[in-house]
């Protein structure tokens, strides 16, 4: 690893630790020439995959878009950012492990709903109302009845 201060390649790792569910390694390094310390991270490069939208269009999977939709559903709910990030990462790693190069949005939506059902029922209803395109109050009543009877959708 090249030192960012003197450009020497003569560096040494002083400390390493695994973070983000063992998907990222943080290394503390020291340059043996100028003695400066710096931090590097190593991240597993995962394959990219496509998402097939309801209208048939495809686009590259966007982890930030997934996070944003979950943040909207969990807004002002007693859900930690750590829990949300863990959910997003778990969904991403599960999707990444699939053999398909193109994954339909309904598969991703189902995974989000299953995770939100376990995490927070109100966030689950919020997400479901958009994902399942609720049209009237009966749609809300039906999903709430399922929650009360503790059936996963």
UniProtKB/Swiss-Prot annotation:
Pfam families: ATP-cone, Zn_ribbon_NrdR. Coiled coil: none annotated. Binds 1 zinc ion. Keywords: ATP-binding, DNA-binding, Metal-binding, Nucleotide-binding, Repressor, Transcription, Transcription regulation, Zinc, Zinc-finger. GO terms for molecular function: ATP binding; DNA binding; zinc ion binding. The keyword Transcription applies. Its cofactor is Zn(2+). Residues 49-139 form the ATP-cone domain. One of its GO terms (biological process) is negative regulation of DNA-templated transcription. The keyword Magnesium does not apply. A zinc finger (unnamed) spans 3-34. Negatively regulates transcription of bacterial ribonucleotide reductase nrd genes and operons by binding to NrdR-boxes. Belongs to the NrdR family. This is Transcriptional repressor NrdR. It comes from Ehrlichia chaffeensis (strain ATCC CRL-10679 / Arkansas).
């Amino acid at each position: 690893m090249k030192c960012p201060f003197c450009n020497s390649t003569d560096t040494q790792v002083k400390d390493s630790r695994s973070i983000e569910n063992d998907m990222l390694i943080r290394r503390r390094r020291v340059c043996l020439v100028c003695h400066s310390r710096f931090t590097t991270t190593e991240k597993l490069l995962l394959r990219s995959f496509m998402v097939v939208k309801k209208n048939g269009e495809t686009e590259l999977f966007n982890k930030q878009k997934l996070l944003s939709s979950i943040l909207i559903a969990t807004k002002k709910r007693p859900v930690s950012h750590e829990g949300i990030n863990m959910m997003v990462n778990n969904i991403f790693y599960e999707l990444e492990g699939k053999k398909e190069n193109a994954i339909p949005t309904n598969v991703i939506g189902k995974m989000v709903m299953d995770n939100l059902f376990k995490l927070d029922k109100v966030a689950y209803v919020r997400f479901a109302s958009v994902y399942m395109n609720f049209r009237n109050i009966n749609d809300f009543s039906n999903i709430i009845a399922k929650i009360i009877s503790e059936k996963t959708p």
